[in-house]
């Protein structure tokens, strides 16, 4: 009788153990076949500046906005000039993961010789110490910039270049810029992507 009881006890333990073992296997199978419903985007190459900034981001495959909504924390906002951007970057936290920063700035300040380009570049290097720096040339010939000449624009961005910032061609140019489908936005984005792809 004791022998029979021992056999039944062992069989019962084995059955319970198998049931306990199989249950997690079933759950694990369900988890492993579940497809994630999100895409992880690394924002390591960022565009910052004024209202023309998202138009370049639209066509770029390598560069993106920190946030689609313009604000100080997003480092871009419509109607803003270089000195606003310098303050926004100053208030931004240190980020060593950013690989490149592209400025799209100058238009709203009418490419003023008084803009503190040195200050903007220096604080950007402090906040993003591992980043390559690029700049997009703005637009003129419209609104408050109707009398601005290409010579003024060239001189403005030459100041960036003198500080080690790569100037991207072509400029947005002499046009009303608030049209995402302007061909120059596509060309600028393509040339920017080429530069980013060559980063080491």
Where are these regions (language model features)?
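Substrate-gating cap/lid alpha-helix
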Residues: 140-199
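A short helix->loop->beta-strand "cap" motif at the edges of active sites that frequently abuts
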Residues: 128-132
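N-terminal secretory targeting modules
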Residues: 1-48, 53-58, 199-200
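Residues at the C-termini of beta-strands that transition into short coil/loop
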Residues: 67-72, 137, 168-171
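Generic structural signal for well-ordered alpha-helices
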Residues: 117-122, 153, 157
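Conserved SGNH/GDSL esterase-like catalytic core that processes O-acyl groups on lipids
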Residues: 39-117, 142-144, 149
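N-terminal cationic-hydrophobic initiation segments that often serve targeting/anchoring roles
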Residues: 93, 124-126, 161
